[in-house]
């Protein structure tokens, strides 16, 4: 568990640096994602068109991929390649991987191809990625208990380290 002092130090660094975060997300969550980044002290940039994502990523400090934007796989690949070339961290939100084999396969491919710094998902999503199975009904599927969630997250991290 991360100590509150460590979390506060990270928060202060973000607030001082004010990183530009390139987000490829779905239209349903775009406003929430932008506002969360603004509240954390970052600058969000929502860009998903395949002709602009590489240019945007050149100027960004990080890339956040939300698999709710599954129709943007071409853009996601281009942005991720540019992020790697620039040394930018990549965060993946595996929205719906427990309910969609397309999203699950796409996310597993991302994890194999790119050095993803963080997978931000609930227990059902992480388990679906670890076991390559889908059993949940949707993105709000019941999560694991804390101990189980920690263990499956650690297993997924070891697999894709």
What are the language-model segments listed below?
Residues 68, 96, 137-140:
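Glycine-centered flexibility motif
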